Amino acid sequence: MLGHKVVGRVVGEDRRVGVPWLGWTDGECRYCRNGRENLCDNARFTGYDLDGGYAEYTVVDERFCLALPEGYSGLEAAPLLCAGLIGYRSLRLTGDAARLGLYGFGASAHIIAQVARHEGRRVFAFTRPGDEEGQAFARELGAVWAGGSDQSPPEELDAAIIFAPVGELVPLALGALAKGGSVVCAGIHMTDIPAFPYELLWEERVLRSVANLTRRDGEEFLALAPQVPVRAVVEAFPLERANEALEAMRGGRIQGSAVLEVATS
């Protein structure tokens, strides 16, 4: 059953919980023992190895459910559980970078831009070339500059996060970095990265990926979100229109996050 971020109420209890992408770990492998359960050798994932949220009911492991902050509806909370969490983990991997580039201004980036601004960082947003609506959206959320991914930012970046699954963005992001900067690839998939000259990586620039999340990431981010406060922009679809929602996402026609809403009797 698809659906990798879920908000619902526990049957028989008046308790609302969030179910993130990481749905189970063995707790015994070397990664789990060292606080890196996101890299668990035997991890299982919501909507992939485990039943997801495209349903009225789903069975989940209570240990991996997250308490949701007050003040968020189910529609508002759902994007925080994947787009928000993977963005949060990516942001933490940039350290204290003051000038932050976000490549692909969609579900994750529009959430993390708010966190970055809250922390006093300067955000530079990169959208599909010619996407003036997306660039205006980024500026509304506090980006000091917004342009196409084919453009150079007006100043060097200390770090960049690539949310778009486009390998061609890697050398572009590296080329925009100051010395010692880092590029974080936040996606679970990316097209092939083209060859690039070593000089783009030289001077202690770093290129790394992000894999999944930990429960600690979830607890930290969901505690921080209402302090910012993070407000996810969502477009809701009823469950029976799931295929329409997926097509809209593939076509880049969603601003923010698409969320499926299950009718309750």
Where are these regions (language model features)?
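Glycine-rich cofactor phosphate-binding loops and adjacent beta1-alpha1 units
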Residues: 124, 132-206
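Short strand-turn motif at the edge of the Rossmann-like AdoMet-binding core
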Residues: 186-190, 210-213, 237
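Mid-domain Rossmann-like dinucleotide-binding core that forms the NAD(H)/NADP(H) cofactor-binding site
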Residues: 16, 70-153
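Cysteine-cluster motifs in flexible loop/terminal segments that predominantly coordinate metals
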Residues: 20-66
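Residue-level marker of beta-strand positions
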Residues: 5, 15-16, 31, 57, ...
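Structural detector of well-ordered beta-strand residues that form the stable sheet scaffold
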Residues: 7, 18, 66, 101, ...
